[in-house]
């Protein structure tokens, strides 16, 4: 896609339609989990799942902090034909998501029970919430990486591929949920494992795209060292969507 020469109206459609489809598919994520958990585990498990939503939103907010900021900077640098800086932004996204994803996951795991009780957990629901969220938090770095790379993928001129990554996670999650909950009898933990595995598979697909040296932005040596200016700009731009989440 020629971002610098294509007609604005055509670009708007090519970006807006995949984004709308991806957002619609993404909204089905928690709905699918809720349906299978409700039928396979019970009403208390649904209550436990609901307790995890604030933490899930916070994790997504940190993903937006890096993803939106990086995507904006990548778009600007590509428009300026500053491909070297755009490459370094990609590398910094990987490192930032590793740091934030691991830190958030481990820190929240340490204080998980007090946090869940703060959100209204009872003795009847804390077990379900803990069982689900502990798996999600161990895979939190995958979530951050997946969200960050998807934002950069879209900014690099591949809105359809970013949409496909989202649809892939939702579809795999919907397939694995009944298998793990009903087939293997893993209960609410099975739903969490399905979510993490779906994101891992999407992340593998993203890595394959960014490993292609024919891509304008691709993984290579020398781009993973954090640059203060890049990090500050990413966080400054991403702060607004972070706070909105």
Where are these regions (language model features)?
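Hydrophobic transmembrane alpha-helices of multi-pass small-molecule transporters
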Residues: 58-61, 173-178, 203-207
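Short runs within selected transmembrane alpha-helices of multi-pass transporters and secretion channels
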Residues: 136-154, 162-173, 191-204
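Helix-loop interface residues and adjacent transmembrane-helix termini in multi-pass membrane transporters
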Residues: 28-31, 40-43, 77-80, 155-156, ...
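Short alpha-helical transmembrane segments in multi-pass integral membrane proteins
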Residues: 1-16, 74-141, 185-238
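Structural signal for membrane-spanning alpha-helices in multi-pass inner-membrane proteins
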Residues: 108, 151, 177, 181, ...
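Interfacial helix-capping/hinge residues at the ends of transmembrane alpha-helices
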Residues: 34, 71-72, 112-113, 147-150, ...
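Transmembrane helix-bundle signature of multi-pass secondary active exporters and lipid flippases
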Residues: 20-72, 136-143, 232-245
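Small-residue-rich hydrophobic transmembrane alpha-helices
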Residues: 46-106, 143-162
